[in-house]
From Swiss-Prot:
The MID/MTR4-interacting domain is necessary and sufficient to mediate interaction with MTREX. Residues 163-266 are annotated as: MID/MTR4-interacting domain. Interacts with MTREX; the interaction is direct and stabilizes NRDE2. Interacts with EXOSC10, EFTUD2 and EIF4A3. HAT repeats lie at residues 305-337, 395-427, 758-792, 978-1010, 1067-1101. It is found in: Nucleus speckle; Nucleus, Nucleolus; Nucleus, Nucleoplasm; Nucleus. The modification N-acetylalanine is found at residue 2. GO terms for cellular component: nuclear speck; nucleolus; nucleoplasm; nucleus. Pfam families: NRDE-2. The keyword Repeat applies. Belongs to the NRDE2 family. Protein of the nuclear speckles that regulates RNA degradation and export from the nucleus through its interaction with MTREX an essential factor directing various RNAs to exosomal degradation. Changes the conformation of MTREX, precluding its association with the nuclear exosome and interaction with proteins required for its function in RNA exosomal degradation. Negatively regulates, for instance, the degradation of mRNAs and lncRNAs by inhibiting their MTREX-mediated recruitment to nuclear exosome. This is Nuclear exosome regulator NRDE2.
């Protein structure tokens, strides 16, 4: 039979020998044509064999022949043996490749794989020994059909539908919709070529894996892999050069010797002299001597020896001086350095690496040292605090609280310990609640008051107790404000004002506890309190009670109903979370004052819709403290005004400074770029005023309160201004007028002309009323503010008249009055900052003002150009006055306030005078002269800081003059061409001395943002953050990177199109995240709500929602009291609004609009 049916005719043609030989390959002589009939018969008999129990997959056709040859039997037996051996090998050797030796019947891998599978359905009909009709062909046929499958398609005689019934089907065929890969015939492709195609124009892509052998290329491991980290932990080999006699001549080239000078030693075992000692021993069959093998371990390197020497030195010193707590603390800090070295404490081999990387080992070692230190110093609070801080890694929060309570019980007079204890309890999310922390503040202040009064005889009051108590009181007020309980915070301030300034004489000699008991009836009497209309104070109420009689209450007919929004929800189509946020913030803004029943309207306590707005005496009684210092009493008023949003110039104490920061106004330059010389820029910002919980990034200007809030502030001013006199009263008037001017600036910024007109009118009315008072007639601070107001309103000529009038009233004070110098300075600065069209004439006016300041004659208005002789005389007068002030500063200790303020104003005026008459370099020389004099005389070490009161006062002088210096440089760069380097250098030097100055940081970040090279900025920030304790460097470093990221994105998205980056900057996102994480490692950073708000806002802006949620919950672990964090989370994750509000309710934060009430409002 022909292999190819198409050539069947050619192969069977009776041709000659040559043609027959050519087509001989088309025929298969070993195939018997007569076997087709027997194959078809055996195929039909297959079901019968299946029913008899034969396997389905390999049901070989049985042969009926009795004359089977011995050769066929042997072939069959060997094939079966091979199959069994293969099965055993597959069972016991799954991962080894074995050679498969096949006989003549198994020539391809596909046939072997198919035969080796059992119990699988097969497409072919199994063949067995075939009965042959011809004896000479029987052996070959039997051998061929006994070991090969025969496919149904190959059997040409079978007609019709041929199939087999599988009694044991494979369910995998139905599940996977295809045959098992072992049942599919496979073959090996020899090359990827294909015959018949043009390789230049055509190609075939074969499916499956490529036949080319893949060469696995070993990649170089990075430094952070596990293996490389292990290599980094291996001890380094100490390398030391050979000692050579020093040469007197300088060596320009140091040669490296490749070989030793001496000839190698040769032996019979080492004929070339190239083997080392270890190789020689190995060739002899010997090992190294035991002592020699242990020698490297016995001799440590120089680094380990130095560390061991330090450890021994510490141990010796603490044995000799066990009372030295600082030495113990240094020993604890030294453990970090010891653990970085290769395990000095390793006991067994292999233990070194584990101990080196074990944080727990370091903590245990530190804890053991601290316990030894506490045994020798039972009264040391610092050691016990260090132990508690260390044990936060080991102990549960409840255990830590108990240990803190024990420590507080032992040291109830330690204010620093109370401060840390309150912060610890305030930042423990698991045990935190507003009521618990509020009562804890009350317990703290009442205990310290008892210590200060002497009621606790066992513990005397420590120095600075009163100042620390005042700082804790302010910290409690900001805590309540940030938690949303504004009513309680305002009530605390109201009570403290009455308790401090209006105390009856009959109770002044009593201890604080007794005074508080007498104060309770006044609080519950319904008498108007500080800030409320008709408030007279505690003392007047006591006199009225002692005298008896009735107090007639006259209702105010002009008093309208308080302004309330008739429609609290203005747009019901907005999403639910937006409606809630708007309504919640609106209620926070309107309802920050405590609710009290109005007797004129016959109201009772039951008329209050929200009981949380009422403040009981139990909420504030324990927190009342007695302030005997006059400075602290004035600071109390300033803090109250700052709390209400009035720029009083008060900066919170360092202990609660960053706790109070919760909004990003510290980055707002405002109008500073337009008016660098005259724009009011407060030294401190970042803390929201009461009632404000705006979203992050909302422009924060002094917009003022609503009508009731403005009336409340006016009442506070009217109540407290008669309590002070002199400079303090002048400062209060200045703050009030500055608050009104700030609202005018807000109207100018928003271009609200209607409100600007009314606000300007009210502000001028207030200024005139204040100047009409007899004690304020010669108050140059108020005259200065009034003239500045007229200038801001655009009334330049009226403002000049006010300035001229005030300067004419001064007479011939020359340069001795600091307020007069400040008035002249502002007048000159306003003239200088006029538009470029009139700047030449304005400069002449400014020179006239500063020149007249030095003359003994009365001031006269500007008439024309100042003569050169008068300018020279004025310069000499400034020089002599400055020398006199600097000479006094070196002698006087402590520095008087008047002397400091006079030096500041005089230096400013002289710098501006030199700038206008000579140039910017002359002004810079004045600054350098003052700085060098003060820095060398007051701070001999050149650090610019000191611990004494005198050093702090002179530091403030340098800081103010530095601000003038930088402002002058900025103005000069604005009006003329000037390099940026001097301003950058001046700011860099100033920030190293004053790292907490927000004004300097704002200027530095702004000018550095214009530079396309961020490397210097980053190095500078890195230097400052490593050494400075304040948090401002971290905040402004983050802001600088965010501004740079915004600039890069703006360039990349020019005109709404994606373009290539012209500023190649990568890694900004990760750099900013790293800055956030590093800033939060300190205690001040981890408990600063502003830092967490910025971090959360940044991650949300990147679109990383899951990471943002993680940061939000991490923020709650550190600042669970900050309501603004929860409001931000509602804005960023509106789907989880219900969960966030439930969390606020659980922690007792103030929720003014519950969701149930919101649903009712939406239905209405």
């Amino acid at each position: 039979m022909a292999l190819f049916p198409a050539f069947a005719g050619l192969s069977e043609a009776p041709d000659g020998g040559s043609s027959r030989k050519e087509l001989d390959w088309l025929s298969n002589p070993s195939f018997c044509v007569g076997s087709i009939t027997s194959l078809s018969q055996q195929t039909e008999a297959a079901p019968a064999h299946v029913s008899e129990g034969l396997p389905l997959t390999r049901s070989h056709l049985k042969s009926e022949s009795s004359d089977e040859s011995d050769t066929n039997k042997k072939l069959k037996q060997t094939s079966r043996k091979k199959k069994k051996e293969k099965k055993k090998k597959r069972k016991h050797q799954h991962h080894k490749k074995t050679k498969r030796k096949h006989g003549p019947s198994s020539s391809s891998r596909s046939e072997t794989d198919t035969d080796s599978e059992k119990d699988k359905p097969s497409r072919g009909v199994g063949g067995s020994k075939k009965e042959s009709e011809e004896p000479n062909q029987g052996n070959n046929a039997a051998a061929d059909t006994g070991h090969r499958f025969v496919w149904l398609e190959d059997i040409q005689a079978v007609t019709g539908e041929t199939f087999r019934t599988d009694k044991k089907p494979d369910p995998a065929n139905w599940e996977y919709k295809s045959l098992y890969r072992g049942d599919i015939a496979r073959y090996k492709r020899k090359g990827d070529s294909c015959l018949g195609i043009n390789p230049k124009k055509q190609c075939i892509s074969w499916e499956g894996t490529s036949t080319e052998k893949k060469h696995s290329r070993k990649q170089v491991e990075r430094y952070f892999t596990k293996k490389s980290v292990g290599l980094m932990n291996i001890d380094g080999v100490a390398i030391s050069s050979k000692t050579e006699p020093p040469s007197s001549e300088p060596i320009s080239f140091i040669p490296v010797k490749d070989l030793e000078d001496a000839a190698p030693v040769t032996t019979w075992l080492n004929p070339l002299g190239i083997y080392d000692q270890s190789t020689t021993h190995w060739l002899q069959g010997q090992g190294p001597p035991e002592q020699e093998s242990k020698q490297p371990d016995a001799q440590p390197d120089s680094e380990s020896a130095a560390l061991k020497a330090k450890v021994e030195e510490f141990n010796r010193r603490v044995r000799e001086n066990p009372r030295d707590t600082q030495l113990w603390m240094a020993f604890v800090a030294f453990q970090d350095e010891v653990m970085k070295s290769p395990g000095l404490y390793a006991i067994e081999e292999g233990e070194q690496e584990k101990r080196k990387r074990s944080l727990k080992l370091i903590l245990e070692k530190k804890l053991a040292i601290l316990e030894r230190a506490i045994e020798s110093n039972q009264s040391s609070v610092d050691l016990k605090l260090a132990k508690l801080k260390l044990c936060t890694e080991f102990w549960e929060p409840s255990t830590l609280v108990k240990e803190w309570q024990k420590l507080i019980f032992l040291h109830p007079n330690n204010t620093a310990l109370w401060q840390k204890y309150l912060l610890f309890c305030q930042s423990q999310f698991s045990t935190f609640s507003i009521s618990k922390i509020h009562s804890l503040y009350g317990k703290c202040l009442s205990t310290l008051s008892a210590v200060k009064d002497g009621s606790i005889l066992s513990h005397p009051a420590l120095p600075g107790t009163e100042e620390a108590m005042f700082a804790l009181f302010l910290q409690q007020c900001h805590f309540l404000r940030q938690a949303g309980h504004s009513e309680k915070a305002i009530s605390l301030f109201q009570a403290m004002v009455d308790f401090t300034f209006f105390k009856p004489d009959s109770v002044k000699d009593l201890p604080t506890k007794g005074q508080v008991e007498f104060f309770e009836p006044f609080w519950d009497s319904g008498e108007p309190r500080a800030g409320e209309k008709g408030a007279r104070g505690w003392k007047a109420w006591m006199h009225q009670q002692e005298r008896g009689g009735w107090v007639v209450i006259n209702p105010d007919e002009d008093d309208d109903e308080p302004e309330e929004d008739d429609q609290e929800i203005k747009d019901k189509t907005l999403p639910r979370w937006q409606i809630w946020l708007a309504a919640e913030r609106s209620r926070d803004q309107r309802h920050w004052r405590p609710w009290r029943p109005d007797k004129t309207k016959k109201q009772t306590e039951e008329d209050c819709e929200d009981p949380e707005r009422q403040v009981l005496f139990d909420d504030i009684g324990q927190s009342l403290i007695r302030l005997s210092s006059h400075d602290l009493q004035f600071q109390l008023v300033e803090a109250f005004l700052q709390f209400l949003g009035v720029p009083s110039g008060f900066t919170p104490p360092a202990s609660c400074l960053y706790l109070a920061m919760d909004e990003n106004s510290i980055f707002d330059n405002g109008l500073y770029d337009e008016k660098p010389l005259t724009f009011f820029n407060p030294l401190f910002s970042g803390a929201s005023c009461v009632g404000r919980m705006d979203r992050l990034g909302y422009p924060r200007w002094t917009r003022g309160q609503n009508r009731e809030g403005e009336e409340f502030i006016r009442n506070v001013f009217h109540l407290v201004m008669p309590l002070f006199s002199g400079k303090e009263k002048s400062q209060l008037c200045f703050s009030w007028l500055q608050y009104e001017i700030a609202k005018v600036i807000w109207c100018l910024h928003t271009k609200n002309k209607k409100r600007l007109k009314s606000q300007g009118k009210n502000c001028k009315k207030l200024a005139k009323n204040l100047l009409k008072e007899p004690e304020n007639c010669n108050n140059f601070c108020l005259w200065k503010q009034y003239a500045h107001l007229e200038w801001l309103l655009g009334n330049t000529e009226d403002a000049r008249k006010v300035f001229d009038t005030a300067l004419g009233m001064a007479g011939s004070r020359e340069l001795k009055d600091s307020d007069l110098c400040e008035l002249s300075l502002l007048y000159a600065e306003l003239e200088v900052e006029l538009s470029p069209e009139v700047r030449r004439a304005a400069t002449a006016r400014a020179v006239h003002i500063l020149t007249k300041l030095t003359e003994s004659s009365p001031y006269g208005p500007y008439t024309g150009q100042v003569l050169a002789v008068h300018i020279l005389k004025a310069r000499k007068a400034y020089e002599h006055a400055l020398q006199d002030c600097l000479g006094d500063s070196c002698v006087s200790n402590p520095a008087p306030t008047d002397s400091c303020s006079r030096l500041i104003s005089l230096a400013k005026c002289f710098m501006l005078f030199q700038y206008l008459t000579i140039g910017i370099d002359a002004a810079v020389q004045i600054y350098e002269q003052v700085f060098a004099k003060l820095n060398s005389s007051v701070f001999p070490e050149g650090s610019g800081e000191g611990d004494s009161a005198s050093s702090q006062s002179w530091t403030s002088v340098l800081e103010a003059i530095t601000l003038m210096h930088t402002s002058l440089l900025r103005f000069h760069m604005k009006v003329s061409v000037y390099p940026l380097a001097p301003l950058r250098e001046a700011l860099s030097q100033a920030l190293k001395l004053y790292p907490g100055n927000q004004v300097l940081w704002r200027s530095y970040v702004q000018i550095q943002n214009k530079s396309h090279s961020a490397s210097k900025t980053r190095r500078f920030f890195d230097t400052i953050t490593r050494s400075a304790k304040p948090l401002e460097p971290w905040l402004f470093a983050i802001e600088a990177e965010k501004l740079r990221k915004r600039l890069v994105e703006t360039v990349q998205r020019l005109d709404g199109r994606e373009i290539h980056a012209t500023i190649p900057e990568t890694g900004l996102m990760h750099r900013i995240q790293a800055l956030f994480e590093n800033a939060m490692r300190s205690d001040s950073g981890s408990q600063c709500p502003l830092l967490w708000r910025m971090y959360l806002n940044f991650l949300v802006s990147l679109g990383n929602k899951e990471r943002s949620k993680g940061v939000f919950y991490k923020a709650l672990q550190n600042c669970p009291w900050a309501k603004v964090l929860y409001l931000d989370a509602v804005e960023y994750f509106p789907d989880e609004m219900q969960e966030i509000l439930d969390l606020m309710t659980e922690k007792e934060l103030r929720v003014r609009l519950p969701l149930e009430e919101l649903e009712l409002l939406l239905e209405d």
